[in-house]
Regions:
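Short beta-strand-centered aromatic/proline hotspots
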Residues: 258-270
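Core catalytic region of metal-dependent phosphoesterases/phosphodiesterases
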Residues: 2, 6, 11-108, 181-182, ...
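Intrinsically disordered, low-complexity, charged/polar segments
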Residues: 280-309
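Active-site environment of divalent metal-dependent phosphoester hydrolases
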Residues: 10-14, 39-44, 67-74, 105-106, ...
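Mixed-charge, Lys/Arg-rich low-complexity intrinsically disordered regions
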Residues: 235-248
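Active-site-proximal loop/helix segment associated with metal-binding centers of metalloenzymes
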Residues: 86, 95, 111-186
Length: 309
């Protein structure tokens, strides 16, 4: 069995379809962990197209609670059961889709993981003005926080993984360009920060911020899909980071031992190279150690490239 983990989907499941179609043969014992804002309970409907898409997968989905979705215990079709050692919410019609209960600890081949869902919606005022769904209990309340803290105390503040939607303040990406940045409620992040200072953990996985960032002991995931506990990407399907005409520095050759710089000539669309883990680029450039005429370097993967400011 295998365990994969990725960030927000917002009902766009192309990255999961690519994973199953091109990169991994998924089985009924495999699990994909989705770190909130999955897009299944956004309207609170008990039957919708998105659930049926995921129900067609052979594997399990463990969904962490996001801020843009109704909590399962408010929806009549959900039941509870014990799954991988912890309590989850599920619908009998879609048994392979389970929602983690905040504060529950789950077992993944001997590795323990705790789930902590919820976050503040930075667009809360806009949603209230326009009538878009907004959920008053989007952030963990005092009861949830106590449950999380008690569970962690039961394991002597030692856990392998944390699965959350938002993150401790120390890992929070800067968002000063966001309108009304100073009005964002950071109480959940501050609470998580106090937990992180005391907790002995291997990796803290989170989503919410729509980016992919690797920290020493934490990972922010969005388009990127990783195997649980592993540093390398299984797949990264999403926005190309670089554009045609942009100047970049890149590595190439055996073990990426050679360096070059040049201009992006072509972006290989996702699906053009379906067997690849992430987007790649054709670059017209020059090797750093042997300046001369420009050469076309084909299919340079995104992780080998850096922008030249």
């Amino acid at each position: 069995m295998a365990y994969y983990i990725t960030g927000d989907c917002h009902a766009h499941f192309e990255k999961l379809i690519w994973l199953a179609r091109f990169n991994k043969e998924l089985g009924k014992e495999d699990v994909i962990i989705l770190l909130g804002d999955v897009g299944l309970n956004y309207f609170g409907a008990d039957k919708d197209r998105e659930k049926k898409i995921l129900a067609d997968f052979p594997n399990y989905f463990l969904c962490v609670q996001g801020n843009h979705e109704e909590r399962p215990y408010h929806i009549q079709t959900y039941r509870t059961q014990i799954w991988n050692g912890g309590e989850v919410y599920y619908e009998p019609e879609f048994p392979n889709i389970v929602f983690a209960k905040d504060g529950e600890i789950y077992d993944f081949d001997g590795k323990k993981a705790i789930a902590i869902g919820g976050a503040y919606s930075r667009d809360k005022e806009y949603r209230l003005l326009t009538g878009l769904p907004w959920f008053p209990d989007e952030q963990p309340n005092d009861e949830v926080k106590s449950r999380v803290e008690n569970k962690l105390n039961e394991v002597d503040l030692k856990i392998d993984y944390v699965f959350s939607h938002t993150c401790p303040l120390v890992y929070r990406p800067s968002q000063k360009s966001v309108i009304n940045f100073e009005k964002i409620d950071l109480s959940t992040e501050e609470w998580m920060d106090e937990i992180a200072k005391k907790l002995d953990y291997s990796q803290w996985y989170f989503g919410h911020y729509h980016d992919n960032i690797q920290y020493i002991n934490a990972q922010l995931l969005y388009e990127e899909i990783k195997e649980l506990g592993e540093p390398d990407s299984v797949q990264k399907v999403g926005r190309p980071r670089y554009r045609v005409g942009e100047m970049v520095y890149f590595t190439f050759g055996k073990e990426d031992a050679r360096e070059g710089y040049g201009t992006v000539e072509w972006v290989d669309d996702y699906g053009t190279l379906g067997q690849e883990k992430e987007v790649s680029y054709d670059i017209v450039g020059i090797p750093c150690e042997l300046p001369g005429e420009k050469t076309l370097f084909k299919h340079i993967r995104e992780y080998k490239i850096q922008s030249i400011d």
